[in-house]
């Protein structure tokens, strides 16, 4: 009796080429996502918080002392915005502050530099200073500096949301 054995071809399982394809797809996806994220990050924010971190660290204690002195002076600032205007009112112990000559504001976006503005607000009496400026809608950071003569008497940083005219 002769039995003819039929040879079956071995089933092709998971081969090295399959592993190469899986690894290529995985790392290709990771690298592609990283490139897209890096491109978006480089277009939206410089990443610069301070120009020189060592110098900033040396100035930290002085800035803390200055902040405590401003707080002890009793001067408080309140920023309000409306379409086409920014209003900053300074008070000392609940009364309008009269000794301040000018207020300078640095208006900037939290994550971009190209829309930053440095402006001087115009006095309107009763401790109020106004800027007739149309800000684009969205989040802003206002670094306010109130001055009497050449001396800075109050400094405040305020985060706010400017609304557009259509709201």
Swiss-Prot record:
One of its GO terms (biological process) is nitrogen fixation. It is found in: Cell membrane. GO terms for cellular component: plasma membrane. The chain crosses the membrane at residues 19-39. The keyword Repeat does not apply. Its main location: membrane. Keywords: Cell membrane, Membrane, Nitrogen fixation, Plasmid, Transmembrane, Transmembrane helix. The keyword S-adenosyl-L-methionine does not apply. The four proteins FixG, FixH, FixI, and FixS may participate in a membrane-bound complex coupling the FixI cation pump with a redox process catalyzed by FixG. This is Nitrogen fixation protein FixH. The gene is fixH.
């Amino acid at each position: 009796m002769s039995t003819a054995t039929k040879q079956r071809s071995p089933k092709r399982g998971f081969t090295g080429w399959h592993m190469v394809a899986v690894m290529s797809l995985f790392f290709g996806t990771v690298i592609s996502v990283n490139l897209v994220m890096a491109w978006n990050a480089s277009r939206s924010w410089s990443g610069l918080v301070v120009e020189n971190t060592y110098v900033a660290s040396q100035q930290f204690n002085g800035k803390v002392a200055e902040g405590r002195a401003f707080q002890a002076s009793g001067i408080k600032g309140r920023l309000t915005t409306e379409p086409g205007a920014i209003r900053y009112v300074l008070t000392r112990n609940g009364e309008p502050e009269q000794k301040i000559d000018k207020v300078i504001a640095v208006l900037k976006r939290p994550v971009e530099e190209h829309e930053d503005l440095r402006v001087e607000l115009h006095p309107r009496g009763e401790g109020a200073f106004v800027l007739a400026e149309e800000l684009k809608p969205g989040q802003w950071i206002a670094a306010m500096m109130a001055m009497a003569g050449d001396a800075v008497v109050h400094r405040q940083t305020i985060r706010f949301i400017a609304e557009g005219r259509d709201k």
